From Swiss-Prot:
ATP-binding is among the record's keywords: yes
PROSITE patterns in the cross-refs: SECA, SECA_MOTOR_DEAD
Recorded topology in the membrane: Peripheral membrane protein
Compartments (UniProt record): Cell membrane; Cytoplasm
Catalytic activity: ATP + H2O + cellular proteinSide 1 = ADP + phosphate + cellular proteinSide 2
Lineage of producing organism: Bacteria, Bacillati, Bacillota, Bacilli, Lactobacillales
The name this protein goes by in its record: Protein translocase subunit SecA
GO cellular component, one term: cytosol
Listed transmembrane segments: none
EC primary class: translocase
Job description of the protein: Part of the Sec protein translocase complex. Interacts with the SecYEG preprotein conducting channel. Has a central role in coupling the hydrolysis of ATP to the transfer of proteins into and across the cell membrane, serving as an ATP-driven molecular motor driving the stepwise translocation of polypeptide chains across the membrane.
Main location (coarse class): membrane
Length: 787
């Protein structure tokens, strides 16, 4: 481990030295640009654009562009980027991740690479985790960009298509990650090119990059339409699983959070639902509902995984502790939780388009990110996104004191100790930020502080709209703030008057998160910009992380320490190391899961790209889609004729071919069965192809002009493609759910999924050809298809 650390540090040092030389070139312009008038400085923007047009690269103009943005920031914002911020800016421009500690001015750092890359006119997206930050940064930094002659757009969920298009057409666009992804999906569902809002994805700088590209990497963005109702099954499955006994009827594997029925549970299910064999193929819908009811009742925990508010089940984000409005668990899990909690069960949805953040952000020509904590995940960033993580030095040294963890045998003992610590610090007036992992523990601690008469503020999913305001005041004398899982990222905690003398902000962690990165984020709230500060984590053997990983080894260590009393405490670096190794195991598991998800997603990604590319060709066509349409019809004719004319001519099934022709191409009164007799396979194909050509000419004549014919062709193709793609997404989802079971048959589930998925895709393409043929040939033309 020490070797790996040394390698990190040395490679970072070399990289910082290289970047430092480029920063020197930027700083050379400092005095010269300070002497320019406002008009002269602003004139740099068109000059730099002209140089790009004349063939210069972005790297060629970087020193002048960075120096221009830097001097502009000094005049407009009253902020002058430090040398370390210039280095951070170069890291971003090169498509990597700048790891910069809290309070080091990431927002200002980004202004230089944003300005430089916006000069190309291809668009730069600045991506934030919520709309509050997008709006704040677009407003504040927008002043600088506008002053320098660039346009700035803000893309919000509430905007209509025209407003969104305007925002995306700006040089610089601020948006949340989810809005970018949903706009991309919606753009690939439109019928007319003019309805699209985005330009091609050029360069994105992702703020809090670890939160978006790692914590939310597997979150699928889903656009869905209604599907069939199965409310009754959810309620029956829920009632049934509530009668089961742990261990006897079902088993839970906590590290993987999976649950399954035992033999006894299977027998009970068969008896309860009156079945001979629960796992018979016709019972798949029922087994699916039972599986989800088991997960809902015994794995999904209220106020940790989800919360109930106003009769609605809301998902709680495990990394921010916020309620995720409008998000629903897919595949019926949300309905199963609704049945468990006895609230109204909402209809299941059918997915019409979906993509994960991993695959969405990999579509940008260049991607960069910034965060206070990414080094622990650098392997993942390199392997999946091809981005290096560079630790940018702080402007002033960090003087915060990080104490070793303290460990208590029970939760009660731990929380009592936390309250005592808070009481002692509160008497001095030292401000405190107390981090909890779940809403449940923040409410428990809040109750204990009420009993101890210590005034405090709680920040969790239930009151996140006041978040920024609460966090901004957390550094004032006497402030006690409880926050779930580092809600409030992106908002600085500045120390109030007299707080430095009291030791700065004290951060108290009431539990270790399963990711070291989240713990580091909590620590990083204290000691910003060289301020004093301290951090202390309190743990207990009953913590979730301890229960799932590593408690046995730690218990054995406690025996060595001879801990008898429940309130006895141990503070030891050895404990901290054991906890870290437990966290590394969880992180390893999580990374493997994300990598595995990505391998499955890549199958869908390739298919999505094919479909979306074909859709784009159809939408962008200005003259005629006849070549595309007739190719589809001719492929169908060839395939159908070949199917019915195999082997010797006496074995051909011309009756079946005639039935297909009259059902799909032409009315029986216009075509006689005898017309198929005495022809070779090629002649039959030629006959039907000619029939299709005649039909095309008739429709063209009926419509009377090319523009109307083009509209008709577009409607036919897009209607069929969209319907087939929606069904295919659904089928691929079901395949993915079932494929895991094949692992037991000595087969590699991923290979099976790839092969089966490819076969299903081929079948879908063939069915698109079939449906387009039938729809086009059989359609009755009514006048005026103009939109």
């Amino acid at each position: 481990m020490a070797n790996i650390l040394r390698k990190w540090v040395e490679s970072d040092k070399r990289e910082i030295a290289r970047l430092g030389k480029i920063a020197d070139k930027v700083q050379q312009y400092e005095d010269e640009y300070a002497a320019l008038s406002d008009e002269q400085l602003k004139a740099n923007t068109p000059k730099l654009k002209d140089r790009l047009a004349a063939g210069a690269t972005l790297d060629d103009i970087l020193p002048e562009a960075f120096a221009t943005a830097r001097e502009g920031a000094k005049r407009v914002l009253g902020l002058f980027p430090f040398r370390v911020q210039i280095i951070g800016g170069i890291v971003l421009h090169e498509g990597n991740i700048a790891e910069m500690k809290t309070g080091e001015g990431k927002t200002l750092t980004a202004t230089m690479p944003v300005y430089l890359n916006a000069l190309t006119g291809k668009g730069v997206h600045v991506v934030t985790v919520n709309e509050y930050l997008s709006t704040r940064d677009a407003t504040e930094m927008g002043e600088l960009y506008n002053w320098l002659g660039l346009s700035v757009g803000l893309n919000l969920n509430s905007k209509n298509s025209d407003e969104k298009r305007e925002a995306y057409n700006c040089d610089i666009t601020y948006s949340t990650n989810s809005e970018l992804g949903f706009d991309y999906l919606r753009d690939n569902m439109v019928v007319y090119k003019e309805q699209m809002v985005q330009r091609p994805l050029n360069f994105a700088i992702v703020d809090e990059v670890d939160s978006i590209l790692i914590d939310e990497a597997r979150t699928p963005l889903i656009i869905s339409g209604g599907a069939e109702k199965t409310t009754g099954l959810y309620i029956r499955a829920d009632r049934f699983v509530k009668t089961l006994k742990a261990e006897t009827d079902y088993k839970i594997d906590w590290p993987t959070k999976t649950i399954s029925l035992t033999e006894s549970g299977i027998r009970k299910a068969e008896k309860n639902f009156g079945l001979d064999n629960l796992y018979d193929t016709e019972n798949t819908a029922l087994t699916h509902h039972i599986d989800q009811a088991l997960r809902a009742n015994y794995i999904m925990l209220k106020d940790i995984d989800y919360m109930v508010s106003d009769g609605e089940v809301l998902i709680v984000d495990q990394f921010t502790g916020r309620a995720m409005e409008g998000r629903r668990y897919s595949d019926g899990l949300h309905q199963a939780i609704e049945a468990k909690e006895g609230v109204q069960i909402q209809d299941e949805n059918k997915t019409m388009a979906n993509i994960t953040y991993q695959n969405f952000f990999r579509m940008y020509t260049k991607l960069a990110g910034m965060t206070g904590t990414a080094k622990t995940e650098q392997e993942e960033f390199r392997e999946i996104y091809n981005m290096e993580v560079i630790s940018v030095p702080t402007n002033k040294p960090v003087i915060r004191v990080d104490s070793p963890d303290v460990l208590y045998p029970t939760l009660d003992a731990k929380f009592n100790a936390v309250v005592e610590d808070i009481k002692a610090r509160h008497e001095k007036g030292q401000p405190m930020l107390i981090g909890t992992v779940a809403i449940e523990s923040s409410e428990r601690l809040s109750k204990q502080l009420d009993e101890a008469k210590i005034p405090h503020t709680v920040l969790n999913a239930k009151n996140h709209f006041k978040e920024a305001e609460i966090i901004m005041n957390a550094g004032q004398r006497g402030a006690v703030t409880i926050a779930t899982n580092m809600a409030g990222r992106g908002t600085d905690i500045k120390l109030g008057p007299g707080v430095t003398e009291l030791g700065g902000l004290a951060v108290i962690g009431t539990e270790r998160h399963e990711s070291r990165r989240i713990d580091n984020q909590l620590r990083g709230r204290s000691g910003r910009q060289g301020d004093p500060g301290s951090t202390q984590f309190y743990l207990s053997l009953e913590d979730d992380l301890m229960k799932r990983f590593g408690s046995d080894r730690i218990k054995a260590m406690l025996d060595r320490f001879k801990v008898a009393d429940d309130d006895q405490v141990i503070q030891s670096r050895m404990i901290s190391r054991q906890v870290e190794s437990a966290q590394k195991r969880v992180e390893g598991n999580n990374y493997d899961t994300r990598k595995n998800t990505l391998q499955y997603d890549d199958v869908m990604r390739e298919q999505r790209e094919v479909i979306y590319k074909q859709r784009q060709q159809v939408i962008n066509e200005q003259e005629t889609l006849k070549p595309v349409l007739m190719a589809m019809i001719n492929r169908t004719i060839t395939r159908i004729v070949q199917t019915h004319t195999q082997g010797d001519q006496k074995d051909w099934n011309l009756d079946a071919l005639y039935a297909w022709v009259t059902a799909n191409m032409i009315d029986p009164e216009k075509f006689k069965r005898s017309q198929l007799d005495g022809k070779s396979q090629d002649e039959l194909i030629g006959l039907l192809a000619e029939m299709a050509e005649t039909n095309f000419q008739q429709k063209n004549k009926q419509l009377g002009d090319d523009a109307q014919m083009l509209e008709f062709e577009k409607v036919v193709i897009l209607r069929v493609v969209d319907s087939a793609w929606t069904d295919h997404i659904d089928a691929m989802d079901q395949l993915r759910q079932s494929i895991g079971l094949r692992g037991y048959g000595q087969m590699n589930p991923l290979v099976e999924y790839q092969e089966e998925g490819y076969r299903m895709f081929e079948e879908m393409i063939a069915s698109i050809d079939d449906d387009v043929t039938r729809l086009f040939m059989k359609a009755e033309i009514r006048q005026n298809i103009r939109r």
